[in-house]
Regions:
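Hydrophobic alpha-helical membrane segments
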Residues: 94-106
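Alpha-helical transmembrane segments and their membrane-interface boundaries
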Residues: 1-74, 78-79, 85-87, 106-154
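The feature identifies polytopic integral membrane transport proteins across all domains of life
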Residues: 86-96
Length: 154
């Protein structure tokens, strides 16, 4: 098992903070309710933290995205229940740091430059990450919410 150095821990803490700030900014731009903004930032920061941790432990980008999006989706679902807000508010803003925007950009860039082999490699990698995100979200959102016992239901 690999141990993290102090520098890596500091870098992870900084990335956690900046991922939360970026997610918060996107949530404000997305016009999320004010009371949901802290949870939006926390969901995005947690997802990015787990992604970076998985990368540090040797996972590739697609596996790290899958590992990160499962707890991210769980956190989004918990926040949605606690704040009585649609889960999409937390999910859309929370996956913002994980979406492979740079991969899409470089795929198009290499394609325009005529470097088809790099475009294909980037496109496949980007597609894997996107599929991993979709599968992870579907796995978590496919789970039923816990129900109150029938004698406590109104």
């Amino acid at each position: 098992m690999m141990t993290l150095t102090n520098a890596q821990i500091g870098q992870l803490a900084a990335q956690f903070f900046f991922a939360g700030a970026g997610t918060l900014s996107f949530a404000i731009l997305f016009a999320c309710p004010r009371r949901a903004l802290p949870c939006c930032a926390l969901v995005g920061a947690v997802g990015w933290f787990i992604y970076e941790l998985a990368i540090l432990y040797g996972a590739d980008a697609a596996a790290a995205a899958l590992i990160a999006v499962i707890p991210l989706s769980l956190a989004a679902r918990i926040c949605a229940v606690l704040l009585k807000t649609p889960v999409t508010v937390f999910l859309l803003t929370g996956i913002f740091p994980l979406v492979p925007g740079a991969g899409i950009y470089y795929t198009a860039y290499y394609f325009i430059q005529g470097n088809n082999s790099l475009a294909l490699a980037n496109g496949i990698s980007t597609f894997k990450v996107a599929v991993a995100l979709a599968v992870g979200i579907a796995l978590v959102l496919g789970l039923p919410l816990p129900q109150a016992p029938f004698w406590k239901r109104k």
